[in-house]
Regions:
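Positively charged n-region of N-terminal signal peptides that target proteins for export
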Residues: 1-4
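Short S/T/G/P-rich N-terminal loop/turn motif that feeds into the first structured element of a domain
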Residues: 6, 15-101, 114-127
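Repetitive helical segments and hydrophobic/amphipathic motifs
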Residues: 11-12
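Short, exposed beta-strand-loop hairpins at the edges of beta-sheets
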Residues: 106-115
Length: 127
């Protein structure tokens, strides 16, 4: 499990090549999705907020969704969402924006299932 978490976090940092390494950050959320219907709803929610962030003027900031292979026997934290942020300031501006807050409020019942039991980390470039 530790290897999986480490590899996903390294991959998250590697995926964010849209900003300088000194400024870019990633938010990493590990959680469990209980069924495929919930997964589909959650993915649709992420697509919606990615579109909203682009409309707000932040097209290089977005969420990606990952899951372990079906053959992986890990019992917990089988799913992961990675937020890709060009800077700490952009992260704050986006999360404070009325459109982001409206999306979060609209989806709070859907996303609360994942947030309640998640392991969350905000990762910064090491160099």
């Amino acid at each position: 499990m530790k290897k999986v978490i480490f590899l996903v976090m390294i991959a998250a940092i590697g995926f964010n090549m849209t900003a300088s390494a000194q400024k870019a950050i990633n938010s990493v959320h590990f959680y469990d999705v209980k069924n495929t219907d919930m997964e589909k709803t959650y993915i649709a929610s992420l697509k919606e907020i990615n579109t909203i962030m682009a409309e707000m003027g932040f097209p290089k900031n977005y969420y990606s969704y990952f899951k372990l292979a079906a053959s992986d026997t890990t019992k917990t934290y089988r799913n992961c969402t990675i937020g890709h942020w060009t800077s700490e300031q952009d992260y704050k501006t986006i999360h404070d924006h009325p459109k982001f807050k409206a999306w979060a409020n609209k989806n709070k019942d859907i996303n609360a299932v994942f947030v309640a039991g998640q392991m969350y980390r905000k990762m910064y470039a090491a160099d």
